[in-house]
């Protein structure tokens, strides 16, 4: 069965194992998520569990949103997402970090940091041209394509806005779970800025 939870990225730190091994970890705070709706094939066409995370003031919610969360007897939520392949939950139930344990392999999804308008070298990793005085080609994108089409093809790698994309990093290991603080420590780095929304769920391609 799939495990999943929504949380916020706190930042990075480091821990040491009993043998003295140094491990860089990302700290993710995941307060209990509330199940707002259980979707079924009969009513919705597919099976999923809708969860809410991070309370917000009622004045910021409209009537439909208030009525939706009232069924779960909880406050309006800032973030609402769905998880599939999670069974045995009812509306109003809570998902906490206690469902995970050290050694679990998970996929982590977040929104990458925005870098603004960037050139092809930083955005796509292209090589630069010669930097000597005789060269007229330094950091430009280069050839736009052959003469025959008389146009630039779609998806040509050019300069543009970089970052701000949905990114999933697969097969990360949970190093430690601290239930009393609603904190999960994940080995390595995860996408997103501090305080950004992070989705943690069981790895799809984990080795069995």
UniProtKB/Swiss-Prot annotation:
GO cellular component entries: cytosolic large ribosomal subunit
Subunit details: Part of the 50S ribosomal subunit. Forms a cluster with proteins L14 and L19.
InterPro entries, alphabetized: Ribosomal_uL3, Ribosomal_uL3_bac/org-type, Ribosomal_uL3_CS, Transl_B-barrel_sf
Family: Belongs to the universal ribosomal protein uL3 family.
One of the Pfam families matching this protein, by short name: Ribosomal_L3
Function: One of the primary rRNA binding proteins, it binds directly near the 3'-end of the 23S rRNA, where it nucleates assembly of the 50S subunit.
One Gene Ontology term of the molecular function aspect: rRNA binding
Listed SUPFAM superfamilies: Translation proteins
Name of the protein described by the UniProt record: Large ribosomal subunit protein uL3
Superkingdom: Bacteria
Region entry Disordered, spans: 116-148
NCBIfam families membership: L3_bact
Native source species: Streptococcus agalactiae serotype V (strain ATCC BAA-611 / 2603 V/R)
Keywords of this entry: Ribonucleoprotein, Ribosomal protein, RNA-binding, rRNA-binding
GO BP: translation
Gene transcribed to yield this protein: rplC
Positions in coiled-coil regions: none
């Amino acid at each position: 069965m799939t495990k999943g939870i929504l949380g916020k990225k706190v930042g990075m730190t480091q821990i040491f194992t009993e043998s003295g091994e140094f491990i860089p970890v990302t700290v993710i705070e995941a307060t209990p998520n509330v199940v707002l709706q259980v979707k079924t094939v009969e009513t919705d066409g597919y099976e999923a569990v809708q969860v809410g995370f991070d309370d917000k003031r009622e004045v910021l919610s409209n009537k439909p949103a208030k009525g939706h969360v009232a069924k779960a007897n909880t406050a309006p939520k800032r973030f609402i997402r769905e998880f599939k392949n999670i069974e045995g939950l009812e509306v109003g139930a809570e998902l906490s970090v206690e469902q995970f344990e050290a050694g679990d392999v998970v996929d982590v999804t977040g929104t990458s940091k925005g870098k603004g308008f960037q050139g092809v070298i930083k955005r796509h990793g292209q090589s630069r041209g010669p930097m000597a005085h005789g060269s007229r080609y330094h950091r430009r994108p280069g050839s736009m394509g052959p003469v025959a089409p008389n146009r630039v093809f779609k998806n040509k790698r050019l300069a543009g806005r970089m970052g701000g994309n949905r990114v999933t990093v697969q097969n990360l290991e949970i190093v430690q779970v601290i239930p009393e603080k609603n904190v999960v420590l994940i080995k390595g780095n995860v996408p997103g800025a501090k305080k950004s929304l992070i989705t943690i769920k069981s790895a799809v391609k984990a080795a069995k």
